[in-house]
Amino acid sequence: EALPEEFDVSTMQKTKIQKGMSSTMSVNRNIDNLMNQLEETFSQRLLRMIDERGMTDSEAYTKAYVDRRHFSKIRKDVNYVPNKKTVLAFTIALELSLDEAKDLLASAGFALSRSSKTDIIVAYFLQNKIYDMFEINDVLDAYGQPVF
């Protein structure tokens, strides 16, 4: 799978040792440059999206059926990554567009898959701007999938 266009690895080519400078130093410098391009973590992105929507934390996690202690882990640890089901629940609770949902999932290291019934169902509801968790759970259950 190709890297996104904005992820430029062309500068990461190892250089031959010249004038006593090791290729490791060159690679480290190039990796440092890439580290300066880091995107938001899942936690940072989620908290920003909650704020942008004018929601309180408790409104967001309650609507996503996430308990307070679990949300506290997300809030306190900038690098914490919940499971995919939790991320999907937040995409619905925050009433994200399909593109926003894909971005939030990607920030946690996940993607919507066409081989997953749950993903197909959630994507359908997001694409059609239907954010009723009860309705989504009914359809998930009808297709034998775990509910939120």
Where are these regions (language model features)?
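Helix-turn-helix/homeodomain-like alpha-helical modules used for DNA recognition
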Residues: 107-148
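General nucleic-acid-binding
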Residues: 1-37
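Short, basic-rich loop-to-helix N-cap that marks the start of a DNA-contacting helix
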Residues: 78-93
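Helix N-cap / loop-to-helix initiation motif
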Residues: 56, 67, 83, 95-100, ...
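Short C-terminal boundary/hinge segments that cap the last helix of small helical domains
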Residues: 96-110
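A short, Lys/Arg-rich alpha-helix, primarily the initiator
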Residues: 23-56, 134-148
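The alpha-helix within a helix-turn-helix
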Residues: 50, 61, 91
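Short alpha-helical DNA-recognition segment
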Residues: 54-73
